Regions:
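Low-complexity or membrane-interfacial segments used for flexible interactions
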Residues: 1-119, 166-170, 175-261
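Non-cytosolic head/periplasmic domains of membrane-anchored proteins
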Residues: 129-180
Length: 261
């Protein structure tokens, strides 16, 4: 999903919500005519206007991005810096974008479309041209997460520790031979985190809460910025990204449980 499509979809959704709230307010006024409680009605109308304004801004931003889109032939493995966005789509979950706003790849649920993966929770990293670059599968034997290349060869796993600290994810990075690479500990509200190889090279680095001014014109202020390590192989790039995606999704799920309890 290109960035302009992302903003257009979100803008349309906001406008629909604003329309729904406005109609709800009008219906409430009609049903209580002569004895209207203006407080809630005014709040509903204000909320609808806020959604309308945000939606209109996002639609306008999408149109501007579409006019100024820059295309090139770079592939996922040619790029080392990405911005990660949650996609407003049923099947696709996360999108990787270059700092100039070009969509490069995204995760999607694929186990439901392949009979061999029936009853398994498998995600694919799909390039913008539709090619599957990697597979990610949850709960594989004794591991919480396994990462595979495009030929479905295992490149590494992640196993969470039995004892988890409050507000963090702890676990071990394992290679395809089930040899421990390193231990990681990521807080739910981290500002910056990195994963390393056995020889202490950086696999991947992720920052939140910081956005260069030029990039902020295209993205939000608190979205993750991902930088792949230097001097690492393509397999290691897939592995590092797979682990990071698991950590971010786990943090999201566990934070929602905390707020819902």
């Amino acid at each position: 999903m290109e960035l302009f499509e992302y903003y257009k979809k979100r803008g349309k959704l906001k406008c629909l919500i604003g329309t729904g709230l406005f109609l709800y307010g009008l219906i409430g006024m009609y049903n209580t005519w002569g004895n209207i409680n203006w407080g809630p009605v005014i709040l509903i109308i204000i909320a609808s206007l806020v959604f309308f304004c945000i939606g209109f801004w996002q639609l306008r931003k999408g149109n501007l991005l579409e006019k100024n889109i820059v295309k090139n032939d770079l592939t996922f493995l040619d790029i080392d810096t990405y911005v990660l966005l949650e996609l407003p789509s049923n099947n696709k979950h996360l999108g990787l974008y270059t700092p100039d706003g070009r969509y490069v790849a995204g995760t999607k649920m694929i186990s439901s479309t392949l009979p061999i993966l029936k009853n398994k929770k498998v995600f694919g990293l799909e390039a913008s041209d539709g090619e599957i670059l990697a597979y990610f599968q949850s709960e594989v034997e004794n591991y919480d997460w396994a990462i595979y290349d495009s030929n479905y060869n295992c490149v590494g796993m992640f196993k969470e520790n039995m004892i988890q600290g409050f507000g963090m994810v702890r676990g071990s990075l394992m290679n395809e031979k089930e040899i421990k690479i390193s231990e990681i500990e990521v807080e739910f509200d981290f500002f910056e985190t990195s994963f390393h190889t056995m020889d202490d090279r950086i696999l991947i680095n992720c920052k939140r809460g910081y956005m260069p001014l030029e990039w902020s014109e295209r993205f939000g202020l608190n979205v993750p910025i991902i930088k792949l390590g230097n001097n690492i192989s393509n397999t290691e790039k897939i592995f590092g990204l797979g682990i990071l995606l698991y950590i971010l999704e786990t943090i999201k799920v566990r934070k929602s449980r905390i707020f819902n309890d």
